[in-house]
């Protein structure tokens, strides 16, 4: 996506890596991955290394690229948005968000939008790139990638991650941004990526995300109350939660999916309104 911007001699593109003070492992041990669940969902930032940025500098556009962890912005992005540097950099600045995730990003984006509003930033576009192997297959493929470090650890598992062709095709977004940035010196106030397929909304996942987010909020508060990340009590609580989650997935989730399919005709108009809302500001 950034290639068209980098190739322009009349555009200065700066990169700011967000480095956790305590690096996250990859592959990620199973229980350690869940230990950060409460802080991630509750958006309690974990420390970053000092940010190598001049926060007094004014930018015409800021692109925030982040992953989704537990239906929430990843910890590094949460920490950045809580920093004094972000408060200075983003105030009054047009922002484009770029999401890379398995398939569910709506609730994470809602949380990030709220934080951007608090900082006085202006969200003008959103891009979401999701796993190519589909919702059902990625439910297995993505965790295996996370815990083994390999995108295709077994021959019978589809390759996890965003398709290379989709990543290459994202250059169209960079081209649209470059065209707008060089068109004039006026502030960017309107979406630049309308009609380019910046996001795709799967209406079947909207209700699931809302229910999942409410459940995550409840369990996060309970687990956080048990003790710090490395405490024995939190580990025991996490084992109970993971067992509960697995039971939920094999029982309630299939029944819920069937029920939603049967009731879909009754909520068609509402679903279309929700799709249009979550597709904003860029649209499908």
List the model feature ranges, each with a label.
Residues 36-40, 114-122, 142-154:
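A polyampholytic, Gly/Pro-enriched intrinsically disordered region
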Residues 134-211:
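Glycine-rich phosphate/pyrophosphate-binding loop and the adjoining helix
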Residues 94-135:
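Short, glycine-/small-residue-rich phosphate/pyrophosphate-handling segment
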Residues 66, 99-102, 160-161:
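Second-shell loop/turn segments in exported
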Residues 75-84, 109-114:
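"Short basic amphipathic alpha-helical interaction patches in structured regions
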Residues 1-65, 71-76, 82, 91, ...:
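N-terminal beta1-alpha1-beta2 submodule of the flavodoxin-like/Rossmannoid cofactor-binding fold
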Residues 25-30, 109-110, 135-140:
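Short aromatic-enriched loop/helix-cap "lid" or pocket-rim segments at secondary-structure transitions
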């Amino acid at each position: 996506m950034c290639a068209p911007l980098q190739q322009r001699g009349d555009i200065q593109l700066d990169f700011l890596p967000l480095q956790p003070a305590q690096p996250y492992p990859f592959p990620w041990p199973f229980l350690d991955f869940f230990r950060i669940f409460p802080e991630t969902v509750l958006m309690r930032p974990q420390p970053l290394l000092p940010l190598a940025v001049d926060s007094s500098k004014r930018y015409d556009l800021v692109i925030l690229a982040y992953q989704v962890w537990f239906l929430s912005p990843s910890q590094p992005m949460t920490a950045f948005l809580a920093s004094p540097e972000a408060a200075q950099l983003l105030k009054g600045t047009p922002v484009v968000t770029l999401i890379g995730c398995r398939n569910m990003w709506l609730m994470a984006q809602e949380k990030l939008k709220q934080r951007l509003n608090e900082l006085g930033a202006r969200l003008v576009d959103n891009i979401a790139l999701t796993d190519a192997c589909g919702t059902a297959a990625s439910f297995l493929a993505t965790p295996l990638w996370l815990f083994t470090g390999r995108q295709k650890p077994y021959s019978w598992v589809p390759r996890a991650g965003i398709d290379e062709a989709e990543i290459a095709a994202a250059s169209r977004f960079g081209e649209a941004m470059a065209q707008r940035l060089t068109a004039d010196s006026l502030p960017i106030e309107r979406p630049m990526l309308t009609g380019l397929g910046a996001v795709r909304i799967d209406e079947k996942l909207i209700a699931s995300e809302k229910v999942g987010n409410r459940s995550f909020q409840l369990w996060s508060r309970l687990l956080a109350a048990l003790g710090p990340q490395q405490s024995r009590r939190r580990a025991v609580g996490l084992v109970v939660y993971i067992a509960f989650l697995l039971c939920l997935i094999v029982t309630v989730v299939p029944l819920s999916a069937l029920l939603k399919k049967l009731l879909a005709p009754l909520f068609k108009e509402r679903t279309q309104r929700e799709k249009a809302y979550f597709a904003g500001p860029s649209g499908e």
